[in-house]
UniProtKB/Swiss-Prot annotation:
Pathway(s) this gene product operates in, as recorded in its UniProt entry: Glycolipid biosynthesis; 4-amino-4-deoxy-alpha-L-arabinose undecaprenyl phosphate biosynthesis; 4-amino-4-deoxy-alpha-L-arabinose undecaprenyl phosphate from UDP-4-deoxy-4-formamido-beta-L-arabinose and undecaprenyl phosphate: step 1/2; Bacterial outer membrane biogenesis; lipopolysaccharide biosynthesis
Top class in the EC scheme: transferase
Catalyses which reaction(s): UDP-4-deoxy-4-formamido-beta-L-arabinose + di-trans,octa-cis-undecaprenyl phosphate = 4-deoxy-4-formamido-alpha-L-arabinopyranosyl di-trans,octa-cis-undecaprenyl phosphate + UDP
SUPFAM superfamilies: Nucleotide-diphospho-sugar transferases
Residues in coiled coil: none
Superkingdom assignment: Bacteria
Natural source organism: Pseudomonas paraeruginosa (strain DSM 24068 / PA7) (Pseudomonas aeruginosa (strain PA7))
Family: Belongs to the glycosyltransferase 2 family.
One Gene Ontology term of the molecular function aspect: undecaprenyl-phosphate 4-deoxy-4-formamido-L-arabinose transferase activity
Keywords: Antibiotic resistance, Cell inner membrane, Cell membrane, Glycosyltransferase, Lipid A biosynthesis, Lipid biosynthesis, Lipid metabolism, Lipopolysaccharide biosynthesis, Membrane, Transferase, Transmembrane, Transmembrane helix
Identification of the protein by name: Undecaprenyl-phosphate 4-deoxy-4-formamido-L-arabinose transferase
Transmembrane segments: 235-255, 269-289
Length: 339
């Protein structure tokens, strides 16, 4: 593993109704990036917020001498789609993702950069001493366990988005066009060298989490069905096992009929109905699972954009640091963009 040269660091932050936390987020993230001793940019993506988040992002990007890029989506597309939109607008040799709720401190950014510079393709993180409630922790643990078992990707904390990706991994993820995307798993699928570090975790100071317990369970189902075919294989095993059990049960009923006569077979009518209902339930479950996969395939085949960028706001060229100008930033104001 060779050291990885990092001249420009991009920090991509998806934002959804985080008006209260944005001033502190910008202040702390800029301070952490300045301590790197490298050129940096902060790409903030507004994911269709209903509060004043988009206005605050645009105002931050229009400041003279700042390295903030505001990406405004026309509506809410979800956290991972917003991150991909930020990836498209980033130019860094290393791209770091960070949540806007400040539960993962921006002060951890230098540690991720340090490990990435050692040559790791992906640097993940594990939340140390989580400050979430039990209603958040237990569903999260179930998600981690289910995804680890079904995808085979060895990660300890899928819910922590404080991660670092080298540029080649980001480009590989952008080349994938599937609609349902979970960035940590997708990135690890392309990475050769990965590592994880423990990071601090704080209580949420403003607002509420966007992931409820039910939404976490829905996320687990989405992950399992969009990233692996393991459920289909398990369904095949279950179907084969139930078919064998049904065949053996039929032989058992035949033996009982021959031994005790037709009267006993009549008494076993309800057992047959119970078995029939059980098999019917498994069949319907299998049809629903197949329908889920077919629906995802249909969405991917249509190849519709995963998001639509309404506008991108970045500082004027004269105000940008020279390292950022060399990286290709030439736009001078708010500009419309397409995915």
């Amino acid at each position: 593993m060779k050291p990885y040269p990092i001249d420009l660091v991009s920090v991509v932050i998806p934002v959804y109704n985080e008006e209260a936390s944005l001033p502190e987020l910008l202040r702390r993230t800029e301070a952490a990036c300045r301590s790197l001793g490298r050129a940096f940019e902060i790409v903030l993506v507004d994911d269709g917020s209903r509060d004043r988040s988009a206005e605050l992002l645009q105002a931050a990007a229009e400041r003279d001498g700042c390295a903030v890029v505001a990406v405004i989506l026309n509506r809410n597309y979800g956290q991972h789609a917003a991150i991909l939109a930020g990836f498209e607008q980033s130019r860094g040799d290393l791209v770091i993702t960070l949540d806007a709720d400040l539960q993962n401190p921006p002060e951890e950014i230098p540690r991720l950069v340090e490990r990435a510079a050692q040559g790791y393709d992906v640097v993940g993180s594990i939340r140390d001493n989580r400050r979430d409630s039990a209603w958040r922790r237990w569903p999260s643990r179930l998600v981690n366990l289910a995804v680890q078992r079904s995808t085979g990707v060895a990660m300890h904390d899928y819910g922590c988005m404080l991660r670092a990706y080298r540029r080649s991994i980001v480009e590989a993820m952008l080349a994938c066009r599937e609609r349902s995307t979970f960035i940590p798993i997708l990135a690890n699928g392309f990475a050769r060298h990965t590592c994880e570090i423990r990071v601090a975790h704080a209580e949420r100071a403003h607002g509420e989490s966007k992931y409820s317990a039910m939404r976490l369970l829905n996320l687990m189902f989405d992950l399992v069905t969009c990233m692996t075919t393991t459920p289909l294989r398990l369904l095949s095993l279950v179907g084969g096992g139930m078919a064998l059990a049904g065949f053996l049960f039929a032989l058992f009923l035949l033996v009982l009929r021959l031994a005790f006569g037709a009267a006993w077979a009549g008494n076993g009518l309800f057992v047959l109905f119970a078995v029939l209902f059980m098999f019917s339930g498994v069949q319907l479950l299998g049809m629903g699972l197949l329908g889920e996969y077919l629906g995802r395939m249909y969405s991917d085949v249509r190849a519709r954009p995963r998001f639509f960028i309404e506008r991108v706001v970045r500082a004027a060229p004269s105000a940008l640091p020279s390292a950022l100008q060399r990286a290709g930033f030439t736009s001078s104001s708010s500009e419309p963009s397409t995915p």
